[in-house]
Amino acid sequence: VFFLFNVLPGDPAQMVLDQNATEVQLQKVKKKYGFDLPIGKQYLIYLNDLAPISFHSKNTNDFTFYSSHKYGGLILFSFSKVSVVFKAPFLRTSYQRQGKKVRTIIAETLPNTIILAVASIIIAVLLGFFLGIISGIYNGTWVDKTIQLISTVGMSVPSFFSAILFSWIFGALLNAHTNLNMTGSLYELDDFGEGAQLQIKNLILPAFVLGIRPLAVIVQLVRSGLIEVMSQDYIRTAKAKGLSPLSVIYKHVLKNSLNPVITAVSGWFASMLAGAVFVEY
């Protein structure tokens, strides 16, 4: 990702300033953010900034010069011209929002991302369990095959493409019926611009799109677990005792097929926090 952003066309120093910036101004910005350094050295400095134990130059003119005000942390020891520092990961300042720390920007937007991820995983779990149970019960029928087809498509389609497709269909073509927006914020100012109001409808499309892939995985896991458990001897015994199919599934099958699903859900939640950027508008 680091190298990809650096090979894209455009000058970040020019983005910080404007088209009328002088060469002297551009050079100052490049020196401030390290854009004038070789790409390989920039990457090593980037890793050094993220590392809890980092190496810093004692030369005040060097880009990696240690300043407690800038990096925080404390110096463990020094040798020659290098200081070894213990610190929290340093995310620098944003060159798009000059002077604002990246850590602060993330802290401002992270709550909404967590809300989106939680909403997505809830949708994925509820629909995934329902469709997985239906698919397992009707194993081999057209219902099972239809659910399996939808699940396979859900796992295959990238989130960014699903986001574009769903926003176009439900936010543009069917907007008169759905009343959903293509873009929007979780909190929006009221008509008087005085207070932020929660807009649940702006959460529906992103949450559903982000939940498609984990939903598809949960469907497969629940279905396979259901089929495997239902073939066990104790399930046949439960049926022989006269328990209804619903009781067998609820009391015996689901409880014994949940472990892989719970493991998958915890892993998917972590990936959702990172992947939410593809569907957040």
Task: List where the protein language model places each region.
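Transmembrane helix irregularities
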Residues: 8, 154-157, 273
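Alpha-helical transmembrane segments of integral membrane proteins
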Residues: 110-115, 119-143, 159, 172-175, ...
